């Protein structure tokens, strides 16, 4: 296994209310990781649901099945040294824990809680789903007629509040955390050296008076 492959066995799982900003922040993280030379797949939870298992509804049990199926895909990707990003509401702690246990059989799992007050989410909602849910048009809608079990400090790995920070600021906080975890300590796709090696080389060149 080469240095680049060694850093592909992880999953970033974004959880939060509808319209909290999960997908927006996840996309920013994906772009940064791709630029760092990491092979990664950004799995759209809605697309997976509609294409792989359109028969599923939105009861607690069906949401759990959906989460487990996505988790299994992440597990397979991680097994093959492909990192994965998932932005899914994942409202129930029980199934978030199931997904963690499943993925950690092959890789590292990071739960990222994208926090945002429901009133702010409603104002952001571009499709008017909250309004339709409040009118009874959409049943089992998280944040209205279905609960969201907020992740605790013991459960999530990092949290960002999109009502207080911009998407870019949220992404940078997450990236700082991933740097601390060594996730961004990857092989550069052109030079084949790690960030720490690059810093060491620059320091030596500075000591020698070249920089």
Q: What role is predicted for each listed range?
A:
Residues 27-75:
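Conserved substrate/cofactor phosphate-moiety recognition/catalytic segment
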Residues 1-11:
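Extreme N-terminal, non-catalytic leader segments
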Residues 14:
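Hydrophobic anchor at the beta1->P-loop junction of P-loop NTPases
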Residues 195-211:
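Short acidic, low-complexity intrinsically disordered linear motifs used
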Residues 18:
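The conserved Walker
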Residues 115-118, 123-173, 181-186:
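Small-molecule kinase domains that catalyze NTP-dependent phosphoryl transfer to phosphate-bearing small molecules
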Residues 51, 57, 74-133:
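ATP-dependent NMP and nucleoside kinases share a basic, alpha-helical "lid"
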Residues 22:
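Conserved lysine of the Walker
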């Amino acid at each position: 296994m080469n240095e680049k492959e060694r850093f592909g066995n992880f999953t970033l799982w974004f959880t939060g209310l509808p319209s909290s900003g999960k997908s927006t922040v996840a996309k920013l993280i994906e772009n940064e990781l791709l630029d760092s030379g990491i092979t990664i797949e950004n799995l759209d939870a809605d697309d997976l649901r509609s294409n792989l298992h359109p028969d599923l509804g939105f009861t607690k049990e069906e949401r759990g099945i959906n989460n487990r199926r996505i988790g299994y895909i992440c597990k397979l990707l991680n097994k093959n040294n492909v990192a994965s990003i998932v932005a899914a509401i994942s409202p129930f702690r029980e199934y978030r824990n199931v997904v963690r246990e499943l993925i950690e059989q092959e890789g590292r799992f990071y739960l990222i809680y994208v926090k945002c007050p429901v009133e702010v989410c409603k104002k952001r909602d571009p499709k008017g789903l909250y309004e339709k849910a409040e009118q009874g048009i959409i049943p089992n809608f998280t944040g209205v007629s279905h609960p969201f079990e907020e992740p605790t400090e013991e459960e999530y790995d990092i949290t960002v509040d999109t009502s207080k920070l911009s998407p870019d600021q949220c992404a940078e906080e997450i990236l700082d955390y991933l740097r601390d975890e060594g996730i961004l300590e990857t092989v550069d796709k052109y030079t084949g050296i790690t960030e720490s090696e690059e810093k060491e080389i620059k320091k030596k060149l500075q000591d020698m008076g070249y920089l």
